[in-house]
Amino acid sequence: MGRNVKTKAKRKNKKKAEASSSEIPSIPTRVWQPGVDTLEDGEELQCDPSAYNSLHGFHVGWPCLSFDILGDKLGLNRTEFPHTLYMVAGTQAEKAAHNSIGLFKITNVSGKRRDVVPKTFGNGEDEDEDDEDDSDSDDDDGDEASKTPNIQVRRVAHHGCVNRIRAMPQNSHICVSWADSGHVQVWDMSSHLNALAESETEGKDGTSPVLNQAPLVNFSGHKDEGYAIDWSPATAGRLLSGDCKSMIHLWEPASGSWAVDPIPFAGHTASVEDLQWSPAEENVFASCSVDGSVAVWDIRLGKSPALSFKAHNADVNVISWNRLASCMLASGSDDGTFSIRDLRLIKGGDAVVAHFEYHKHPITSIEWSAHEASTLAVTSGDNQLTIWDLSLEKDEEEEAEFNAQTKELVNTPQDLPPQLLFVHQGQKDLKELHWHNQIPGMIISTAGDGFNILMPYNIQNTLPSELPA
């Protein structure tokens, strides 16, 4: 199930040089920028493994528009390789009857263990020492097969494409799916997860048959299909679902099932694209819409938004509410821009604390890190996954010193935002990303050609176990 992953690193010309390297003057490497630079005939981009602590790619058959990482009992803040993780994903098959929900157990996720990233650009001796440290890895010994993740899967039949799927944070075996048929269904996946946890061979290499299972709830009260759905992090079982007709329904747990309020929240004038419960107030949630607005609602105050504001000049595709700084809400638009707002400033006027126009295609996913309040990741239709640290600011003196030290090695673009921390490529038609809440620094992304698991090298210095004792 593995595949070769090619991502941004450096340009490689396939043409053989006729002269030896000693006869050719050293030419500084030029950073290749997607959307700005083009590849010439015979050139290709290749992955630079040193940019990652871990990088793996795999596919599961049909593409998956949406997935979620499942909470497990393997421990918090895990930093030791190899890693094990669980996830749920829904397919987008050619025929409605061929779709399924997959429960995945992924083991042997290998990677490198490094020392803390140096605070400054060191001298030659420091770099040599760092290189030696970088070569030390939990997984450097042995053949390539020993470094390949093992994937086990159990599949449950799902009629229609899965537009979005989410696992309840308090009970990750309970999942909800939004189907393109217009149905919202809640599932109990405990038997499948137990089977995966107890066996090393169950569903290995994707050989699991598609099983038939009835959902706990099958809600057909929406007037159209939808994508927006979110579980409450504060009240177990409380759920929201929003559709393409601009309506939002509230679900409340009731006697082992759910009671869905038949009267929807109404305030948007076009499709509701995403929903996010407040991480701090159990009765408050936010929504975004094709109408270009973001609305904040209080379920105690009726069916109209408590406040609403124009967020972008195009469709607002996705939002993410910062779990570590609950005043911060990020939004991503169809025009490729994304913004961060301080909700405390909404009523006073301009609440935008950051706005980025780096991406040139629609933003398809945005999510704050679960471990760093200033860090978030974004996916876009330009086939880039970018990671941003809002705490970073441009330091003219430091930048000049760095450029002086590296000018013979690399030509650094001058127009990159200082908050841009990492760019990952290699996937086509990126749809969604999630940070792993229990493995700091790990991101999983899904695209039209499969999944990637990545842990960028330059964010590893925030990991608890990597800090000096």
Curated annotation (Swiss-Prot):
**The protein's name:** Protein HEAT STRESS TOLERANT DWD 1
SUBUNIT field: Probable component of CULLIN4 (CUL4) RING ligase (CRL4) complexes. Interacts with DDB1A and DDB1B. Associates with HSP90-1.
Against InterPro entries, the record matches this protein to: Glutamate-rich_WD_repeat, Histone-bd_RBBP4-like_N, WD40/YVTN_repeat-like_dom_sf, WD40_repeat_dom_sf, WD40_rpt
Q: Where is this region: Disordered?
A: 1-29, 115-150
> Does the record's keyword annotation contain Repeat?
yes
User: Taxonomically, which superkingdom?
Assistant: Eukaryota
Which pathway is this protein assigned to?
Protein modification; protein ubiquitination
| Traits of the deletion mutant | Increased heat stress tolerance associated with the accumulation of HSP14.7, HSP21, At2g03020 and WRKY28.
Coiled-coil region: none
Among PROSITE patterns, the record links this protein to: WD_REPEATS_2, WD_REPEATS_REGION
Signal peptide (from-to): none
**Is the Heme keyword given for this protein?**
no
This entry's comment on induction and repression of expression is: Accumulates in response to heat stress.
Q: Which family does it belong to?
A: Belongs to the WD repeat RBAP46/RBAP48/MSI1 family.
Basic residues bias: start-end ranges: 1-15
What's the encoding gene here?
Answer: HTD1
GO cellular component terms, alphabetically, are:
Cul4-RING E3 ubiquitin ligase complex
GO biological process: one example: protein ubiquitination
Query: What is the native source organism of this protein?
Result: Arabidopsis thaliana
Q: Outline what the protein does.
A: Probable substrate receptor of CRL4 E3 ligase complexes acting as negative regulators of thermotolerance by disturbing the action of HSP90-1 and by preventing the expression of heat-inducible genes (e.g. HSP14.7, HSP21, At2g03020 and WRKY28).
Where composition is biased (Acidic residues), the residues are: 124-143
Lineage of producing organism: Eukaryota, Viridiplantae, Streptophyta, Embryophyta, Tracheophyta
